[in-house]
């Protein structure tokens, strides 16, 4: 069967309603066009439609405050020795609502992966970090709690470019990072473009997301850990070879529960549906599920990797074998690799999945043609 026909069969039911949670209403002090964004805000602030702002250093939204970003806003991080990032603390909100043709763009003065620090949102939803609380990798802000319906606001039609600033060997900034974010938050139609770390990362929480695109993120396109249990619908990851973008890209999905305690509760168990993952034919790993993570995958295509799907750790493989985790209609360009030989490629096929399919994509256009949710100009490629 041709690749496009595979896409069409998977995405025929890919029409979905808008977020029913979150808050889009703005209100507050309007920041003039051309202003510099820096420091901490403690009251409601509005970045007005079509305006351009400079981000210089940290920009922190404190508990009780709301940062409203209207359609068409451009935030440009200053390129110097000071790391630039946006941090939304517990109890604060960000309402960033663009449109498909008037996208909110967060970028850098220098069009280079790793130029700035991205956006970090901390919520009160549960996580399996030690003691149920954690500190954000960027900004050292607390996250976690027991409010799984917590609402940190809205992100719609937002693109983050050239993030991934390296603080040290252990800490690099993703494009979008969600720390203990609850399912009262709305995230849809967002893109991570040419970052030097992950595109989207989830540290616990219950946030649901849809219509996400990660292009040429040099670490993982999608990454989760610490007990993320949300739903993700319509995900795309696309990687080009190093001789095109100037660097290699790692996993398309990297899935963990907790690296220090594979059985930590709550266990990571997201539900992913309608997913297209295209690798760069350079690095090996495509979908890597490990360290006790559970998952439900349905209607997925993964290709362009030597090891398109790898399952690691006894806990992860037993969850698949016992149908706690599920894979259905997952189409892979090569066999599933089982580290512990518990959930084998034969079991994978028995569960209604397919391997060794010829799946080749010459450009992002091949993906866009079969994703009717990628319309307008909000996706850059």
For every predicted segment, state its role.
Residues 102-103:
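Glycine-rich loop(s) and the adjacent beta-strand/alpha-helix scaffold that form part
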């Amino acid at each position: 069967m041709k690749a496009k026909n595979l896409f069409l069969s998977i995405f025929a039911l890919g029409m979905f309603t808008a977020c029913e949670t979150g808050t889009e209403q703005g209100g507050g002090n309007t920041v003039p066009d051309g202003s510099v964004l820096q420091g901490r805000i403690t009251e409601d602030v509005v970045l007005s439609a079509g305006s351009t702002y400079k981000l210089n250093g940290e920009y922190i939204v404190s508990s009780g405050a709301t940062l409203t970003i209207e359609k068409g806003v451009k935030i440009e991080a200053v390129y110097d020795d000071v790391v630039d990032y946006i941090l939304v603390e517990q109890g604060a909100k960000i309402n960033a609502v663009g449109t498909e043709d008037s996208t909110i763009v967060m970028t850098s003065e220098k069009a280079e992966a790793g130029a700035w620090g991205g956006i970090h949102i901390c919520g009160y939803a549960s996580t399996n970090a030690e003691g149920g609380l954690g500190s954000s990798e960027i900004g050292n802000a607390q996250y976690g709690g027991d409010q799984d319906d917590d609402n940190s606001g809205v992100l719609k039609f937002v693109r983050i470019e050239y993030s991934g600033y390296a603080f040290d060997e252990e800490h690099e900034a993703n494009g979008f990072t969600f720390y203990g974010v609850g399912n009262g938050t709305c995230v849809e139609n967002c893109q991570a473009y040419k970052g030097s770390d992950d595109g989207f990362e989830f540290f616990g929480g219950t946030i649901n997301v849809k219509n996400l695109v990660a292009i040429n993120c040099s670490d993982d396109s999608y990454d989760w850990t610490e007990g993320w249990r949300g739903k993700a619908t319509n995900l795309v990851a696309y990687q080009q070879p190093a001789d095109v973008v100037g660097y290699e890209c790692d996993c398309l999905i990297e899935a963990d529960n907790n690296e220090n305690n594979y059985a930590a509760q709550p266990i990571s168990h997201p539900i992913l549906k309608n997913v297209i993952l295209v690798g760069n034919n350079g690095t090996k790993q495509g979908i890597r599920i490990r360290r006790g993570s559970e998952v439900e995958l349905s209607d997925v295509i993964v290709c362009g990797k030597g090891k398109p799907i790898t399952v690691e750790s006894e806990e992860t493989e037993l969850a698949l074998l016992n149908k706690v985790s599920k894979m259905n209609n997952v189409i892979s360009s090569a066999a599933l690799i089982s580290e512990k030989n518990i959930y084998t490629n034969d079991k994978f096929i028995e569960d209604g999945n397919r391997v060794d399919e010829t799946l080749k994509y010459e450009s992002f256009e091949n993906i866009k043609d079969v994703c009717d949710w990628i319309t307008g100009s909000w996706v850059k490629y």
